């Protein structure tokens, strides 16, 4: 039988002939928690570590995943804590904890392992790092994963709602048509789970475009990076010159929040690589598709994204997936500094606003469902060239409506002030929408995107059965979403029917760059092999999205 005892110097294993110090601290199991949600579960040991160093008593609390006890490194809690060297000491430390943990009845809690909205026992709550927001919630019922709880809201709980609202107004007044549109996008990201539940999906990207040193990234970080980092680092920003896998893993951590990818710049030696990488990221987020890769399975489709750039995306397909905001001159440094000085109040407004939303959740959800149903009905009856941009402006107006409705209901503004602000914000959003339309039209004309392209040509071949998908081994469907086609077959049909003069490689590169191919998991090939024959595998849902985003010629084929 293994015997252990604790001493002021740590845990000691008592053998028949000798005693051995396992570690230099005494762990006490405070609780055992069984955390569970619909997707994941975890058993946690809640430990209190106590040790005496140079006559001073040191006490630290730590939670350990039951499955990874053997990997526990006490020095990560405090450099003075240590397990004695050697595998036997490590094994005996684990055995000591397990011998006590097995005799404790676990406390069951709901497991929160990501930011954003959660539903538990019919109640909706919102997780902002170490903070949970909801109506009459009992915090003891929830366990927040340490990877999430390590993020602390950088806010001031003692400031008044009036002060916090004024901080919001100061930010929105930094630059008309820029800081206000940016703020509405950040607030939209917090409301996105609610919008989705009401029947409206709003996956889109804010594209901040301006010259270098225009302070656009600083402005975006001020609006969206609301977690405290003791090192003073920006926790939600990653550079575009990082690897795609690194960017994808980073963005996946910010589910239902905003992350920043910075920046697409004009360096001629790297511009093409950066643009291709930016295209990959924006299509995953905007289209709600997961990039398959053997090295990562991170899902970024629920992350709201701000992309900063010195240059525009030069295709309607790419730019149409974003909400464009031009930064034509440097951001006013005096106003920016003023807002930075009161950023804790700004972030306190986010908390106040979310508390109001979740206290009135059912009523707001019901109202949104009615509004969205009317909008979607009207939208389906309307033919519009750039539908996504129209949806972006609509959802921005919806967010503005609820933002200032909160202020009115909390008596922060009068009814007349509410009407004035609402009218002014609608005009700002309409102006931004018009800039987007003008830019899209300009790009379409200059690049020839109003003409037929391979995506539209293939769409027409499928729609009018120019391609036989029933009896042709070179072209067939798998399920409802995947088109398998030999590249030679694709080249022959498109070149003949639409008078193109493109090579096989051109078509392969074209559809790969549009990010609508299903590639091999290692990403080395753009084709898939079946019975030693290689096929392009095209996702039809993404082909349709690609056509919809540049649909000016589709009417010609009806």
Task: Locate predicted features.
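P-loop NTPase catalytic core of nucleic-acid-dependent motor ATPases
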Residues: 140-233
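AAA+/SF3 P-loop NTPase mechanochemical coupling elements
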Residues: 252-254, 292-308
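Structural recognition of the conserved hydrophobic beta-strand(s) that form the central parallel beta-sheet
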Residues: 260, 302-310, 324-326
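Phosphate-sensing "switch" segment of ASCE/P-loop ATPases
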Residues: 299-301, 317-416
């Amino acid at each position: 039988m293994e015997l252990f005892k604790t001493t002021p110097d740590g845990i000691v294993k008592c053998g028949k002939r000798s005693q051995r110090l396992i570690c230099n601290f005494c762990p006490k199991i405070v609780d055992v928690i069984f955390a569970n949600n619909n997707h994941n579960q975890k058993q946690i040991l809640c430990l209190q570590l106590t040790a005496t160093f140079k006559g001073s008593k040191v006490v630290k609390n730590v939670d350990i995943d039951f499955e990874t006890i053997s990997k526990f490194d006490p020095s990560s809690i405090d450099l003075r804590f240590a397990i004695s060297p050697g595998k036997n000491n490590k094994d005996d430390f684990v055995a000591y904890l397990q011998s006590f943990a097995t005799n404790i009845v676990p406390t069951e809690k709901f497991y929160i392992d990501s930011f954003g909205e959660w539903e538990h026992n019919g109640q909706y709550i919102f997780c902002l790092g170490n903070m949970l927001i909801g109506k009459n919630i009992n915090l003891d019922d929830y366990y927040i994963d340490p990877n999430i709880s390590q993020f602390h809201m950088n806010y001031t709980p003692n400031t008044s709602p009036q002060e916090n609202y004024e901080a919001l107004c100061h930010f929105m007044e930094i630059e008309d048509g820029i800081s206000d549109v940016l703020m509405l996008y950040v607030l939209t990201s917090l409301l996105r789970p609610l919008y989705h539940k009401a029947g409206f999906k709003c996956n889109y990207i804010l594209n901040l475009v301006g010259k270098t040193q225009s302070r656009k990234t600083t402005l975006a970080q001020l609006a969206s990076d609301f977690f405290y980092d003791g090192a003073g680092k920006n926790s939600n920003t990653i550079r575009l010159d990082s690897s795609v896998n690194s960017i994808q893993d980073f963005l996946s951590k910010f589910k239902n929040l905003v992350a920043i990818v910075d920046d697409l710049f004009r360096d001629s030696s790297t511009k093409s690589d950066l643009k291709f990488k930016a295209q990959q990221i924006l299509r995953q987020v905007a289209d709600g598709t997961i990039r398959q890769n053997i090295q990562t399975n991170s899902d970024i489709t629920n992350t709201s994204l701000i992309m900063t750039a010195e240059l525009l995306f030069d295709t309607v397909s790419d730019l149409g997936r974003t909400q464009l905001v031009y930064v034509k001159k440097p951001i006013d440094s005096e106003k920016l500094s003023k807002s930075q000085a009161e950023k804790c109040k700004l972030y306190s407004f986010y908390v106040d606003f979310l508390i109001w939303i979740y206290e009135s959740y059912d009523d707001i959800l019901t109202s949104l469902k009615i509004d969205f149903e009317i909008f979607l009905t009207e939208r389906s009856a309307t033919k519009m060239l750039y539908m996504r941009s129209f949806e972006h402006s609509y959802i921005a107006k919806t967010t503005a409506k609820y933002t200032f409705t909160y202020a009115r209901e909390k008596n922060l503004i009068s009814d007349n002030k509410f009407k004035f602000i609402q009218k002014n914000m609608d005009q700002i959003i309409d102006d931004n929408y018009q800039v987007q339309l003008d830019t899209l039209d300009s790009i379409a004309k200059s690049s020839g995107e109003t003409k037929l392209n391979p995506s539209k040509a293939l769409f027409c071949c499928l729609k009018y059965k120019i391609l036989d998908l029933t009896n042709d081994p070179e072209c067939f469907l798998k399920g409802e979403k995947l088109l398998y086609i030999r590249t030679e077959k694709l080249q022959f049909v498109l070149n003949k029917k639409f008078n193109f003069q493109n090579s096989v490689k051109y078509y392969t590169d074209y559809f790969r760059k549009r990010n609508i191919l299903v590639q091999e998991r290692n990403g080395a090939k753009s084709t898939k092999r079946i019975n030693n024959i290689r096929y392009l595998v095209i996702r039809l849902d993404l082909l349709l999205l690609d056509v919809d985003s540049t649909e000016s010629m589709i009417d010609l084929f009806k």
